[in-house]
From Swiss-Prot:
Entry's transmembrane regions: none
Binding of UMP, residues: G57, D77, T139, G140, R141, P142, Y143, F144, T145, T146
A single cellular component GO annotation: cytoplasm
Regulation: Inhibited by UTP.
PANTHER family: URIDYLATE KINASE, URIDYLATE KINASE PUMPKIN, CHLOROPLASTIC
GO molecular function: ATP binding; UMP kinase activity
Gene (UniProt): pyrH
Species per Swiss-Prot/TrEMBL record: Mycoplasmopsis pulmonis (strain UAB CTIP)
Taxonomic lineage of the native organism: Bacteria, Bacillati, Mycoplasmatota, Mycoplasmoidales, Metamycoplasmataceae
UniProt main location, coarse: cytoplasm
CDD domains: AAK_UMPK-PyrH-Ec (cd04254)
Protein name from the UniProt record: Uridylate kinase
Positions bound to ATP: K14, L15, S16, G17, G58, R62, N167, Y173, D176
EC number: 2.7.4.22
Superkingdom classification of source: Bacteria
Protein family: Belongs to the UMP kinase family.
């Protein structure tokens, strides 16, 4: 798997909110991890690759338990969207500390002092200027996951690939490798195969959108050293999902 095969022009990195936390130190955001991500992305940008990010909010808010506590689903989802804005601002600060230029665009209408309202043309121009664009607020509508937001924004900005880091899992398997030691890992798999086998790498809406817009998906273990940088260059154990 050579250098040029994985030298994408524009990528979208999907980061989970939970992945930003440090549970051992009881930190919602591990700033050492943010610093590490920033250093990797600095090297990616030096290669001429344009970087956008969609970040989740699971380190601040888990909507799954909201309904049983009397919070309706749509309101719980909006709380989650606000959590992604907090993460986006934290990432921006960490990136700027490493000398990167970063913008936070929100799908929700917020005060411009907090985050810019998303306009596709502006975001695209930022990417062309080697600025990192962070998309926060999910899709701006309830009942959609941040995976769907990732494929939506990847489609809108014309990303070549979505780079999706998983915690402790280095690709797509036929079954949960943490529960089934005989699970088979795929080096390459098609979106149709993912759908037919009902593999839970993203929700169905996200998978269908990525397939329709011919966006490749790279799944890798984000806990490995320099994993983001190496995944983009094909230098790490991963799975590539294609049409």
């Amino acid at each position: 798997m050579g250098w040029f095969k994985y030298m994408y022009k524009r990528i979208l990195l999907k980061l989970s909110g939970e992945g930003l936390a440090n549970k051992e130190k009881n930190l919602a955001i591990d700033y050492k991890l943010v610093e590490d991500i920033a250093k990797q992305l600095k090297e990616v940008v030096k290669k001429g690759i344009e970087v956008a990010i969609v970040v989740g909010g699971g380190n601040f808010w888990r909507g799954t338990s909201a309904e049983k506590n009397g919070i309706p689903r749509n309101r719980a989802d909006y709380i989650g969207m606000l959590a992604t804005v907090m993460n986006g601002l934290a990432l921006k600060s960490g990136f700027e500390k490493e000398g990167l230029v970063a913008r936070v665009y929100s799908s929700l209408n917020l005060d411009p002092k907090v985050a810019e309202n998303y306009i596709n043309e502006k975001a695209t121009k930022n990417l062309e200027n080697n600025e990192i664009v962070i998309f926060a607020g999910g899709t701006g509508r309830p009942y959609f996951t941040t995976d769907t937001a990732a494929t939506l924004f990847a489609s809108e900005i014309g990303a070549d690939a979505i780079i999706m880091g998983k915690n402790g899992v280095n690709g797509v398997y036929s079954d949960d490798p943490k529960k089934n030691k005989d699970a088979k890992k795929f080096d390459t798999i098609t979106y149709d195969e993912v759908l037919n086998m009902n593999l839970q790498i993203m929700d169905l809406t996200a998978i269908s959108m990525a397939k329709e817009n011919k966006i490749e998906l790279i799944v890798f273990d984000i806990t490995e050293k320099n994993s983001i940088y190496n995944s983009i260059l094909g230098k790490i154990n991963h799975t590539k999902v294609v049409n």
